[in-house]
């Protein structure tokens, strides 16, 4: 329940708090995004959306309007707003067949237990920079401290 097609050239994707925040840092630096969808049952197919995107964080002015597009989810971290420039399909014959056994609920349960203060602290500690040290601006900080290995 985290992807919305707004029109033929725009999608928005709600992203939840997790251990890394690579996409936010790299979209901020290069603004390019690719979303890939694979058919794991039925006819083989891969669909890719190519375009430009921006990360909308909880502290950004556009957050309130964009977040209303989704059902509230514990741990909501940012929304990626993507302008689609190109849609491409490919055969998908190399994609294995999988049967979905169900959704995992652990991330939602974890975020619920953490609560908003705990999530904010977690994002400050774990999501301020990408693995390669790029800033994510997750909590509105202009210059995050670079973590030493």
Residue ranges with predicted function:
Residues 1-149:
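Binding-site signature for planar aromatic cofactors or substrates
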């Amino acid at each position: 329940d985290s992807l919305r097609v707004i029109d033929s050239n725009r999608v928005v994707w709600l992203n939840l708090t997790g251990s890394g925040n690579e996409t936010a840092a790299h979209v901020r630096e290069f603004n390019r995004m690719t979303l890939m969808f694979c058919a794991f049952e039925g006819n083989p197919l891969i669909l890719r959306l190519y375009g430009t995107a921006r990360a909308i964080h909880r502290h950004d002015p556009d957050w309130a309007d964009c977040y209303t597009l989704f059902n509230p989810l514990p741990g909501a971290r940012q929304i990626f707003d993507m302008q689609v420039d190109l849609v491409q399909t490919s055969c998908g014959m190399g994609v294995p067949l999988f049967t979905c056994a169900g959704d995992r609920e652990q991330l939602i349960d974890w975020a619920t237990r953490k609560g908003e203060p705990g999530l904010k602290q977690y994002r400050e500690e774990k999501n301020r920079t990408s693995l390669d040290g790029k800033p994510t601006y997750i909590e509105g900080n202009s210059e995050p401290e670079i973590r030493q290995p």
